Amino acid sequence: DGMWKLETERGSWASLPNYMVSLLKAWYGDYAMKENEYGFQWLPKLGGNESLTVTIERAKKGEVDGLLVFGQNIAVTNPNTGWGRTAIRNLKWLVVCDLFENETASVWYADPNGPKPSEVQTEVFYLPTNSCLEKDGSVSNTERLMQWHDRIKEAPGECRSDAWWTYQLGKRLKAMAEASGLPRD
């Protein structure tokens, strides 16, 4: 009964079940019924420790098919960069969305101690993002400071914001889901 039993909660958390029912009904429409917990079981769930270190170790063992990497350089996150690079080369696919082509995006051809590019089977997609100087909007961070700024120049080439790339991916996934015919989609 998980999230539906929150009798001890106070404040806004006490409204979580009502909020979730409304959200799930908005997502799943007529398929969200009390009998199927409004589709709650269709949502992806964390299976345990999903930290970056554990995920990279799982990738190294071949247990992860692909990764979406936004604004990180996981090939050199750990002091043992060979460990991260080897893990990345075990993926079937890798999407890197970053301001610059970094070691993660170029792991298939620019690893000084790695295999030849022809031996790497990972399909890498590099999506260039724009910097904060190249986009309008609000910016916030962990210090709870919120700022608004105007773009001072256009982004070069095909650079887009992380949000733009994510939205485009979401549109395509939605189209695929609509074609599946499954109630959860």
Language-model features: locations:
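Non-catalytic alpha/beta scaffold blocks inside enzyme catalytic domains
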Residues: 2-185
